């Protein structure tokens, strides 16, 4: 896959998910990324720092002007900890953990987050309002309930399968209750 094509498809994917998930300024968007899968390999076996940099930089270019925070999930070797801006970690009172990601412990996306974020830190867990999973890395543990699957307009990025999640408030009250319009499903 050509790198410019990778950047353009990443931009289209993220813009679509942000729009359909109805998130805005102050929201958190989680990224799960297997650069190994993007290049056609097996998750964790062919990590590419350059692929991680291209994808994370592109996502930040989409999210930052909207005031949306990016959280980059690491692999299971780091217990799926996430890289976020220190400002977010402090504002949300998130548990900061002491680890520096490597290509094979944390992954290319986390390394790129350390390259491109202003003051990156690792946090143990987070509850994001939406996110994208590039390469079947399983982001669900970091997306707030109630999770709503979104079918991305592009289903593969290179060799990686792409899925996405948004979240909505729980519906409570039963048959007599009335609800606000659902901005995700538009019904």
Curated annotation (Swiss-Prot):
InterPro entries: Antibiotic_NAT-like, DUF436. Belongs to the UPF0340 family. NCBIfam families: TIGR01440 family protein. This is UPF0340 protein stu1894. It comes from Streptococcus thermophilus (strain ATCC BAA-250 / LMG 18311).
């Amino acid at each position: 896959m050509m790198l410019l094509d990778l950047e353009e498809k990443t931009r289209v994917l993220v813009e679509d998910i942000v729009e359909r998930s109805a998130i805005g300024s102050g929201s958190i968007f989680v990224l799960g990324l297997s650069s190994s899968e993007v290049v056609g390999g097996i998750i964790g076996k062919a990590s590419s720092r350059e692929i991680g940099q291209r994808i994370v930089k592109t996502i930040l270019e989409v999210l930052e002007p909207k005031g949306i925070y990016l959280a980059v999930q690491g692999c299971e070797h780091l217990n799926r900890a996430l890289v976020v801006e220190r400002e977010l970690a402090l504002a949300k009172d998130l548990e900061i953990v002491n680890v520096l990601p490597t290509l094979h412990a944390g992954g290319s996306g986390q390394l790129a987050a350390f390259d491109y974020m202003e003051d990156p830190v690792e946090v143990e867990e987070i509850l994001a309002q939406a996110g994208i999973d590039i390469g079947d890395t399983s982001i669900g543990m970091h997306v707030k309930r109630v999770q709503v699957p979104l079918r991305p307009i592009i289903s593969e990025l290179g060799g990686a399968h792409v899925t996405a999640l948004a979240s909505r408030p729980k519906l409570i009250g039963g048959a007599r209750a009335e609800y606000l319009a659902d901005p995700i499903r538009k019904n």
